Design a protein with these regions (language model features):
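Hydrophobic transmembrane alpha-helices of multi-pass small-molecule transport proteins
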Residues: 50, 72, 103-104, 112, ...
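Helix-helix packing/entry segments at the starts of transmembrane helices
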Residues: 39-41, 79, 83, 97-104, ...
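Transmembrane alpha-helical segments that form core, pore/gating elements
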Residues: 50, 109-111, 115-117, 147-203, ...
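Cytoplasmic-side transmembrane-helix entry/capping segments in multi-pass membrane proteins
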Residues: 12, 66-73, 121-133, 154-155, ...
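Glycine-/small-residue-enriched transmembrane alpha-helix faces in small-molecule transporters
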Residues: 1-37, 88, 147-174, 193, ...
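Specific transmembrane alpha-helical segments of multi-pass solute transporters/efflux pumps
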Residues: 18, 22-23, 51-102, 135, ...
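Structural signature of hydrophobic alpha-helical transmembrane segments
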Residues: 31-48, 88-106, 151-164, 211-226
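Membrane-interface helix-cap regions at the ends of transmembrane helices
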Residues: 21, 25-28, 32, 46-64, ...
């Protein structure tokens, strides 16, 4: 890891904006598509620009190399499972609440990084910062945290999905010596391979009559909230570590609530 620079904070903010925009787009996509189809097509559309980038930059994609099991595992844990859980959960809650729930990620990241990394141990300053950040989000958006018996299961799925993002980040650190573009392309390829037969068999998307806005949101989710976002995420992970990258979750609710209000007219 390196010392954090102003560029790193800028990239973290861009990543937060891209990921915050994912929640209202997932909501729009659910108007026409099932959660498995959303997860599959999101990964599929995300893989295309990353693979093209590897081709242009002449970067070898190692999805089927001797390290294939790392890429497959990260693809399942970091893409397949959380994408499905979040898409399923967003069906019954507002997109801005989903964004707020993601603020729990730094707590999980700090705890797991302490036990499973050598250079990101919890100390007083770090733990205080994480707790202050989380408390600030809860205080600012307490009026939006409307969880009841009708949506508590959906809220739990989103929280559970956010945990898989952290676990996937830990696994990614194990192959941080590999090129960012290669890692991103490889896990997207494996995510596509795994989800394609499952989504086709269980949801049969060819029987759908999707709305245009749902399809456009799905394409956006793939190219921007998956392909570009994961390139950024792995770059930040590699250079700044898991705990710093997880702090993106403190910015996501701010952008998520604003975008939910502007696009879906959700209450602030």
């Amino acid at each position: 890891m390196r010392e954090t620079r102003s560029l790193d904070y800028f990239l973290l903010t861009i990543l937060a904006l891209i990921w915050a925009s994912a929640f209202f787009n997932i909501k729009i996509a659910t108007y026409s598509y099932g959660p498995l189809t959303i997860a599959f097509l999101r990964i599929f559309f995300g893989a295309i620009p990353v693979i093209l980038l590897c081709y242009i930059k002449k970067i070898k994609i190692e999805a089927f190399s001797k390290d294939w099991y790392w890429f497959a595992a990260i693809g399942i844990i970091n893409l397949v499972i959380p994408f499905f859980l979040i898409a399923y959960g967003v069906q019954k809650i507002q997109s801005n609440l989903a964004a707020i729930l993601m603020a729990s990620t730094p707590l999980t990241a700090a705890a797991l990084a302490h036990f499973f990394t050598n250079n990101e141990k919890i100390n007083l300053v770090k733990s205080t910062g994480v707790l202050i950040g989380f408390s600030g989000i809860v205080f600012l958006f307490s009026d939006n945290i409307l969880i009841n018996e009708n949506n508590i299961f959906s809220a739990f799925l989103i929280l559970f999905g956010s945990c898989f993002y952290v676990i996937g980040g830990l696994l990614t650190l194990k192959i941080s010596n590999k090129k960012n573009e290669n890692v991103t392309a490889s896990i997207l390829i494996w995510g596509t391979i795994i989800l394609m037969p499952v989504s086709l068999f269980l949801e049969q998307p060819w029987n759908l009559s999707p709305r245009l806005d749902s399809t456009l949101s799905l394409i956006y989710l793939g190219i921007f909230s998956t392909g570009i976002a994961w390139l950024l995420r792995f770059y930040i992970l590699k250079h700044n570590g898991l705990v710093f990258q997880a702090q993106v979750a403190y910015l996501i609710p701010i952008f998520g609530v604003i975008l939910g209000f502007l696009i879906l007219n959700e209450a602030i």
